[in-house]
UniProtKB/Swiss-Prot annotation:
Gene Ontology molecular function: rRNA binding; structural constituent of ribosome
Name of the molecule in the record: Large ribosomal subunit protein uL24
UniProt cross-references to CDD domains, sorted A to Z: KOW_RPL26
NCBIfam families xref list: rplX_bact
Coiled-coil intervals, chain numbering: none
Keyword set includes Repressor: no
A biological process from GO: translation
GO cellular component: ribonucleoprotein complex; ribosome
Disulfide bridge positions per record: none
Gene3D superfamilies named among the record's database cross-references: 2.30.30.30
Organism the protein comes from: Serratia proteamaculans (strain 568)
Gene this chain is encoded by: rplX
Length: 104
């Protein structure tokens, strides 16, 4: 099955503490989760690693978010949009369902 959300897609968060925020997908994980730039930030306590010259402390990083809690952002309409698939010139492409515009 083809992925509706891919790396470098611009998304909008539908539910949770970051509802309404937009960001770019950094990584798509296999368990139906994605990591998005600047979304779902958590504080991680890291031990120092003297061998690698890394200091310890509290570090903020992005945690994974469920694919069901995000949607692709359609710049033409300015809203979240659903994704469909169709064939153009023998290739399977994604498109926005609201205005049938092909996703690059």
């Amino acid at each position: 099955m083809a992925a509706k959300i891919r790396r470098d897609d611009e998304i909008i968060v539908l539910t949770g503490k970051d509802k309404g925020k937009r960001g770019k997908v950094k990584n798509v994980l296999s368990a139906g989760k994605v990591i998005v730039e600047g979304i779902n930030l958590v504080k991680k306590h890291q031990k120092p690693v003297p061998a690698l010259n890394q200091p310890g402390g509290i570090v903020e990083k992005e945690a994974a978010i469920q694919v069901s809690n995000i949607a692709l952002f359609n710049a033409a309409t300015g809203k979240a949009d659903r994704v469909g698939f169709r064939f153009e010139d023998g290739k399977k492409v994604r498109f926005f369902k609201s205005n049938s515009e092909t996703i690059k």
